[in-house]
From Swiss-Prot:
Cytoplasmic membrane side: 1-19
Bridged cysteine pairs (disulfide): 214-230, 339-355, 366-395
Annotated active site: 229, 274, 370
Native organism: Rattus norvegicus (Rat)
Name of the protein in question: Transmembrane protease serine 11B-like protein
Extracellular side: 41-420
Length: 420
C-alpha cells in the first residue's frame, strides 16, 4: 500500500530544461558577486585613511634658534604643549572617532613668533574627504582662537592640505626617533623576545666578511654610532658592511663602509672611550622600517630608574646561541654609585659610562649586542640614544649589569666628526 501510493508522485516529477538550470546558476553567481562586491566596497571605505600637513603661528615668542633643533629642550617643550592642545581639540570634537594621530613635525622661529608645522592622520567611514577636511580645519581654527593659557596663537595663519600616504610617510621618516610601528610589550634579550618589523628602525648589524659581528645605531643618512672594541679584529672598510631590519640574515638594505672613526683616546683592551663612528659610502634611504634615532643634547639628563630599551642579535645566554630575529629588553638605568659598589664593579664605572639592567640580574645585553643602542622615549614618544652597549661581566649575572657608553658625554665629539 505505501509503495503504491508513492509511485505516482515519483512518476509525476519533471526535469528542468538545461537552459533553466544554467540561468538559475548564473543568477546565484550574480547575487554572490554582488554581495562580495558590496563587502569589499564597504571594507575599503571603512579603512580609508587620510593624511594632512599644515601650519599655524604661535605669537609673542622671542626669536630663539633652539626651536629649530628637533632635539632641543625648547623645541620639545613647545611641541608637547601644542600636541596636547590638538589631541584635546580632536578628542572632544564630533569627529573624535575618525581621529588617529597628530604631531608637530618642525618649529620655525621668526621675529616674535614660531611657525608650527603639523602632521595629521584621520579615517573616514563615508569617504567624504572634502567634508572631513573642512571639519578638521574648523576644529583647528577654533582651537587657535581659544588662547587660554600661556600661548597666543594666530587662527588667521592656519593652513591645511591633504597629502598622499607616500608623502606622509616621508615626512615622518625624515624625523629622528619616530616609530610608525610599535609593540605594547618589551621583554629580555637574554631569554629572548622578538622585535616587530620596524619597531626599532635605527638598529643596524655591523658585519665582518658578511657575518654579524656587532650592533650599531643609525644617526644620520651616512653615519652610525657603535663601540670602538667592535674593530679589534679589523677596521678595514673593505671587510665591513652594514645591514638593517629585524633578521640578521639575509642582509637587508646592505650598505658598504667608507670609513671607521675610532675615538682618539680609546685603548685596546680597556673600556674608556669605547665609541666609534661608521661612515657609509652612500646615503641610507629612510623608510618606515629604517631611519635614524635622535641624539640627545649634551646637557640632557637620564636619571637612575628611568626606563630604557636595549636591542640586538646577541646571544640569548652567556656563550649561548644567537637569534635569527632582533631581540629587545626593557631595563632601567642604575645609579652609578650602586654600580660602583664593591659587590658590583668596584669603582670601574667612569662618568662617561652608565649602567643599565637590574642588580638582580637575568635581563641583560650579551655577546653580539656590543655597539648596539640603548634608547629612551621622551614624553612625546620620540626615542633618544642614551647609551652604546660596551661591556659587562658575562650576561645577566647578579650585581653585574650591562655597562654602556653615555652618549651625552660624547655629543660634542660626535658633532665634530659628523656635523650632526
Amino acid at each position: 500500500m505505501t509503495v503504491s501510493k508513492l509511485r505516482p508522485v515519483i512518476a509525476s516529477r519533471k526535469s528542468f530544461p538545461p537552459w533553466m538550470i544554467i540561468l538559475g546558476v548564473l543568477g546565484v553567481l550574480a547575487i554572490l558577486g554582488l554581495i562580495i562586491g558590496l563587502l569589499v566596497h564597504f571594507l575599503a571605505v571603512e579603512n580609508k585613511i587620510y593624511y594632512y600637513q599644515g601650519s599655524f603661528k604661535v605669537l609673542n615668542i622671542p626669536y630663539d634658534r633652539n626651536y629649530e633643533r628637533e632635539t632641543s629642550l625648547e623645541s620639545n617643550y613647545l611641541s608637547k604643549i601644542l600636541e596636547i592642545k590638538m589631541v584635546d581639540a580632536f578628542e572632544s570634537s564630533n569627529i573624535y572617532k575618525q581621529y588617529i594621530n597628530s604631531q608637530i613635525i618642525t618649529l620655525v622661529p621668526e621675529n616674535n613668533s614660531v611657525t608650527a608645522h603639523i602632521w595629521l592622520v584621520f579615517k573616514d567611514p563615508w569617504s567624504n574627504k572634502e567634508n572631513l577636511r573642512r571639519r578638521i580645519e574648523s576644529i583647528l581654527h577654533q582651537m587657535l582662537e581659544n588662547n587660554s593659557g600661556s600661548l597666543t596663537t594666530d587662527p588667521g595663519s592656519l593652513k591645511l592640505t591633504e597629502i598622499t600616504k607616500v608623502d606622509a610617510e616621508k615626512i615622518i621618516n625624515n624625523r629622528c626617533g619616530r616609530r610608525p610601528r610599535m609593540s605594547a610589550t618589551y621583554d629580555r634579550i637574554t631569554g629572548g623576545s622578538t622585535a616587530q618589523k620596524g619597531e626599532w628602525p635605527w638598529q643596524a648589524s655591523l658585519r665582518v666578511n658578511g657575518k654579524h659581528h656587532c650592533g650599531a645605531s643609525l644617526i644620520g643618512e651616512r653615519f652610525l654610532l657603535t663601540a670602538a672594541h667592535c674593530f679589534l679584529r679589523t677596521n678595514n672598510p673593505k671587510n665591513l658592511t652594514v645591514s638593517f631590519g629585524t633578521r640578521v640574515t639575509p642582509a637587508y638594505m646592505q650598505h658598504y663602509v667608507e670609513e671607521v672613526i675610532i675615538h682618539e683616546d680609546y685603548v685596546k683592551g680597556q673600556h674608556h672611550d669605547d665609541v666609534a663612528i661608521i661612515k657609509l659610502t652612500e646615503k641610507v634611504s629612510f623608510r618606515n622600517d629604517v631611519h635614524r634615532v635622535c641624539l640627545p643634547e649634551a646637557t640632557q639628563v637620564f636619571p637612575p630608574g628611568e626606563g630604557v630599551v636595549v636591542t640586538g642579535w646577541g646571544s640569548l645566554s652567556y656563550n649561548g646561541k644567537s637569534p635569527l630575529l632582533l631581540q629587545k629588553a626593557s631595563i632601567k638605568i642604575i645609579d652609578t654609585n650602586a654600580c660602583n659598589s664593591e659587590e658590583a664593579y668596584g669603582g670601574r664605572i667612569m662618568d662617561t659610562m652608565l649602567c643599565a639592567g637590574y642588580m638582580e640580574g637575568y635581563v641583560d645585553a650579551c655577546q653580539g649586542d656590543s655597539g648596539g643602542p640603548l634608547v629612551h622615549p621622551n614624553s612625546r614618544d620620540i626615542w633618544y640614544l642614551v647609551g652604546i652597549v660596551s661591556w659587562g661581566h658575562e650576561c645577566g649575572r647578579v650585581n653585574k649589569p650591562g655597562v654602556y657608553m653615555r652618549v651625552t658625554s660624547y655629543r660634542d665629539w660626535i658633532a665634530s666628526k659628523t656635523g650632526i
